[in-house]
């Protein structure tokens, strides 16, 4: 089952018979794992494709559905834009989620364009995720690394067949996060005292400012970019900003190479 979010709240199953804007029936079927392009040239287009996008920089994260038993799963993002929930016992997929912001990547990836010598590859959910117990919720919190500038918190269902929810989302357009760059930093869950009470918070770095890099290996000795040079602390339950610090100083580099 592949889900797409509708803002915060329970996610919606991607329906090949009623695809959302930006997708077609065959694109949804491809996301669902069908060999709609007959990659193996056997004339069958409704069989399993048995392939997923490359998890280039992200690493698997172990978690549990919190159903009272040892119901462990592995979560990993991939560069076709999907976050996968995988059964640790047999490797089967429980469900996958496509962030709405990455819908427009799907037809581009299907066309599989050639990559020129100075072209940066198209990335999806490329970062590492953190499992966090916040109140009664099990949350999966992560960014996009090379895929973009968002931070997501997914509320996990209590069973493998339950529906995941998008608990909260942070983007550079969110108030207080204008310095947020590409979200390379893996979020860290901790507790601090706020207003005399302990609070679960998530801390992450401001990320990378891609505007300061030249693709193709050109040297960049200094940057006046305004993105990424910040540290953020947010309420783990809501995503609301608790504290931040930023610097307007130069960031000196020896060399910036690309593509990665």
Which sequence ranges carry the predicted segments?
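A fold-level detector for beta-propeller and closely related beta-sheet-rich head/sensor domains
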Residues: 1-260
